[in-house]
Amino acid sequence: MVVVSPPSPDAVAPTGSDARWIPDLLGPSYRRLELPLGTDPDGEGPISATLVRHEDSPDQPVAALLVVHGLSDYFFHTHLAEFLADRGIATYGVDLRKCGRSRRDGLTPHFITDLERYDEELDQALDVITADHPGLPVLVAAHSTGGLVVPLWLARRRDRGALDPVVGLVLNSPWFQLDLPDRARRLVDPVIRALGSARPYYRLPLKTSDRYVVSTHIDHDGDFHFDTELKPPGGVGVRAGWLAAVRRAQKRLQAGVDLPLPVLLLRSTASSVGTHRGDGVLDVDTDLILDVRSMERFADRVSHQVTDIPVDGARHDVFLSRADVLEVVFRHLGDWLDQTLAPHTKES
């Protein structure tokens, strides 16, 4: 069984290390760096993002990978970092503004009215990674809402001739569509736009369930340790201004971004969004959050080099699946990494 253990006590900073990197909640193998972002354009005061670095990465890595989370989430995937380290890859994770480690008193968790603003911390994170590893190829792995944010960010970098050193993208159950029937979506979109403009902080009265988070946490039905203050079982709520921003971004992505990059799409074979088995129990070994059919439908709008891997038994965050399923996920990820990095690996 794969288990992500509770964090160990903080380590002492290595001799000669950059003092800006401080001990992280994940323990001595991880350190974090604050990425200052100035004053919040949405009017909530000073904001920052947080970059986390795996300190046990190889001395001479072949690549670096940046992990970007989704809504009501943060970076805690130590098992992924260890898998990547074994393959010679240095891992970083970013907690975006108002998310995870970047939450502060007086800030509305995960709230933003334009997803393009995340470009600032993503650009900063990439600058830090390239300074740590000059000339090294970089990959990005993005989950759920992060899987919507990142392709659009990379498209804007491409448009200004700054896509390098990014050489590949992993999409982990990306959120490409508002999963409603077409007619309902057409009716709801004007309401979302109006509310997002008039009352951006309005918390929509949407039904939520804690089943997905409970199914993954080690104290309940899962194998993974994470902070339920930073990843709350019931979520952080959906604000009108945030959802309006998501819908604008989804429509831009659906129009096509056509990244000149290989893309790996990891997702479940099935969803149980709003559905139950006959005994009234949710099938937790499916995607409980999003409809995987939307991921399949819009993947080719991201790139024409998409490897779509539906994994039986995978959960919404495929890296939080059962141990036997995770083994399959890692096998596919490893194969894709080998293929993607081969043209960029220097001969010894």
Predicted regions and their residues:
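N-terminal cap/lid segment of alpha/beta-hydrolase-fold proteins
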Residues: 2-59
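Short, surface-exposed "cap/lid" segments of acyl-processing enzymes
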Residues: 52-99, 103-105
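Conserved alpha/beta-hydrolase "nucleophile elbow" surrounding the catalytic nucleophile
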Residues: 69, 142-147
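Alpha/beta-hydrolase active-site loop
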Residues: 111-132
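Alpha/beta-hydrolase fold nucleophile elbow
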Residues: 132-144
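Alpha/beta-hydrolase-fold enzymes
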Residues: 145, 150-240
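Serine-hydrolase catalytic core
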Residues: 203-310
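Catalytic active-site module of serine/aspartate enzymes centered on a nucleophile-bearing elbow/loop
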Residues: 305-348
